[in-house]
Amino acid sequence: MERFKQKLQAAAIPFRENEPLAAHCTFKIGGPAQLFVMPENEQQLCSAVALCKEQAVRYYLLGNGSNILFADEGFSGVVIDVSALDAEIAVEDTVLTAGAGVRLAALCKAALKHGLSGLEFAYGIPGTVGGAVYMNAGAYGGEMKDVLTTVRYLAAEGEVREVPAAELDLRYRHSIFEENSGCILSAQFHLQPGNAADIRAKMDELMAKRLDKQPLDKPSAGSTFKRPAGAFAAALIDQCGLRGYRHGGAAVSDKHCGFVVNLGGATCADVLALCDEVRAIVKEKTGYDLEKEIRVVR
């Protein structure tokens, strides 16, 4: 790792050692990253990834950390913070192009500023453009695949490619990037001309719903379980009497049963044990086998 650090320094790529990962995810859980790399532009990102491969160093690409549960022991290897990249948004007619590190909130506000409709559903989803494309994020009847047209990414072979959204196998909380280890660099979205007042009203309406129904006052990673076919995870959990159910510092939210929250001092082990208990009870009582939506990074 010393050789790796020397090369980062030579390339003027910022990094920290033993960086607490709890500070870089919305769950506020996780031990230290051996190295935490903070590329400031696309070139530095590509260089950092290439260096990891050259030195056979294990790495993980991190956006806003809004769908992540880091292990208590941390991450042995390199965590690359994509959210530190230049947050650039370009608008041309009805097309928005955004870097992977752009926050979804900023993307939605850019669309509003230019009177473009189609991203209202994403307002209030925590995270970055890269993370949202990676998992085909969605809410309130909309998904990224509805407006995504093309993606630029760094392929495993080291070359930058641009592919149409149709080739990304976009479906419920899934994209091809889960399998091909590509690093998303930027994405392009096609929107529709709209009335700014109507767009603003829709964004405000959906944000009000979030504030009313979701436990945004407590650390979490958003929806904990994927929606099973023909049902809703939160309803099944509530039906089984698990509202407020606890394990250590982790609990099923009293406000929304689809969320597991950190009540203070929760560990990764607490969250995983709670999820296992909830899954077992729901399976026994309803027959549904819940699948975790949050990503566990060890």
Residue ranges, per PLM feature:
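N-terminal flexible segment immediately upstream of the FAD-binding catalytic core
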Residues: 1-38, 42-43, 76, 240-261
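Short amphipathic alpha-helices in soluble, non-transmembrane regions
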Residues: 4-8, 48-52, 202-203, 274-278
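Phosphate/pyrophosphate- and phosphate-bearing ligand-binding catalytic cores of soluble enzymes
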Residues: 16-17, 23, 68, 154-276, ...
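N-terminal glycine-rich flavin-associated loop
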Residues: 21-57, 71-116, 143-162
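Glycine-rich beta-strand-to-loop/alpha-helix junction loops that act as flexible
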Residues: 62-66, 100, 263
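Acidic, glycine-rich active-site loops and adjacent beta-strand->loop/helix elements
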Residues: 66-67, 84-86, 102-104, 125-129, ...
